[in-house]
């Protein structure tokens, strides 16, 4: 099932316009407010869409109501014909207007938290990464690639291996401590394409009775499907796998040096289509982070021009360190 998801551009606004939008246009439109705990950050959803409120509650851990938000996302049906995304970076306030796709709600909430971390300078470098991560006996592996290349499919394929546990299928937080990289999950439950069963046969029976949204997706508790041990909150990152699809390159899997990995991540806009602020200063911050990440991990390039099963075998060998 192929469903077209609309693209969006981010309009950066100033604090005055943000205040005017809230006070004069949208304050009376908000029916629900929910705070999420994103690795210790408080991101608040304000919406008039009940379905999104309920999916948010399933998707994220809740935050104590006494904690003031580090960022906010207004998700409102205003009756407009076109979806709009506006962002005010000083207060970390995002507006997602006239959108019917929950994937953008959760991705923009995570993007707001990532923008906060980029501006929060601390002893330990903390950043967010758009990618999947799994744990195998305390050893973490991240799969970072542009959207649509197959990182989510590969992550769920790995979960069928004994002792492999999911940290996240889409987005994670990192903390660089000395020569190590700690990885933290971003979501309580995952928002996934249920047609992943067409790629991984063993999931077909497990996912057949799941209730879907209009985009063929659902927020799913992976533990209920694969058991309580299927997910883990954190791991120590040892391996990074980048995916590419290049029929002119006959090499299917290889280790790469920091310089090639940096070129890959820069050429692919940090493999993150949901970055809210794109300017020279932000680019330098992100490049510096990935340089530190690559210095502390073993980086692999996997070419996805072969079959899903063959790629899964190659990635499995990296994760299991065979």
Question: Where do the PLM segments sit?
Answer:
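Structural alpha-beta junctions
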Residues: 66-72, 118-121, 163-164, 296, ...
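Long, basic/Gly/Ser/Thr-rich N-terminal segments
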Residues: 1-104, 312-322
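Post-Walker A alpha-helix
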Residues: 154-155
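Glycine-rich, often acidic-flanked micro-motifs
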Residues: 1-26, 130-146, 160, 164-322
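Non-catalytic, well-ordered alpha-helical scaffold segments
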Residues: 71, 107, 234-238
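Short Pro/Gly-enriched beta-strand edge/turn motifs at strand-loop
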Residues: 15-18, 68, 111-117, 272
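Conserved lysine of the Walker
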Residues: 151
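Extreme N-terminal, non-catalytic leader segments
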Residues: 78-139
């Amino acid at each position: 099932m192929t469903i077209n998801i609309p693209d969006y551009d981010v309009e950066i606004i100033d604090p005055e316009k943000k205040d005017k939008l809230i006070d004069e246009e949208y304050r009376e439109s908000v029916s629900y407010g929910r705070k999420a705990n994103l690795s210790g950050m408080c991101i608040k959803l304000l919406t008039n869409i009940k379905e999104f409120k309920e999916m948010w509650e399933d998707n994220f851990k809740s935050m104590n109501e006494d904690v003031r938000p580090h960022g906010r996302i207004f998700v409102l049906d205003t009756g407009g014909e076109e979806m709009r995304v506006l962002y005010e970076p000083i207060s970390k306030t995002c507006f997602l207007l006239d959108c019917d796709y929950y994937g953008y709600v959760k991705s923009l909430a995570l993007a707001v938290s990532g923008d906060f971390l980029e501006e929060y300078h601390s002893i330990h470098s903390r950043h967010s990464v758009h990618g999947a991560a799994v744990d195998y006996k305390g050893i973490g592996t991240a799969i970072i690639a542009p959207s649509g290349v197959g990182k989510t499919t590969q992550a769920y394929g790995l979960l069928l291996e004994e002792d492999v546990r999911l940290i996240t299928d889409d987005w994670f937080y990192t903390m660089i401590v000395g020569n190590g990289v700690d990885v933290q999950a971003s979501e309580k439950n995952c928002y996934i394409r249920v047609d992943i069963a067409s790629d991984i046969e063993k999931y077909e029976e497990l996912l057949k009775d799941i209730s879907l949204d209009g985009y063929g997706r659902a927020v799913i508790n992976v533990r209920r499907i694969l058991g309580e041990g299927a997910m883990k909150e954190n791991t120590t990152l040892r391996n990074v796998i980048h995916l590419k699809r290049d029929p002119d390159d006959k090499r299917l899997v290889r280790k790469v040096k920091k310089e090639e990995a940096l070129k890959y991540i820069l050429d692919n806009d940090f493999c993150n289509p949901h970055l809210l602020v794109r300017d020279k200063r932000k680019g330098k911050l992100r490049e510096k982070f990935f340089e530190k990440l690559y210095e502390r991990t073993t980086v692999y390039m996997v070419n996805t021009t072969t079959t899903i099963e063959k790629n899964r075998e190659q990635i499995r060998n990296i994760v299991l360190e065979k």
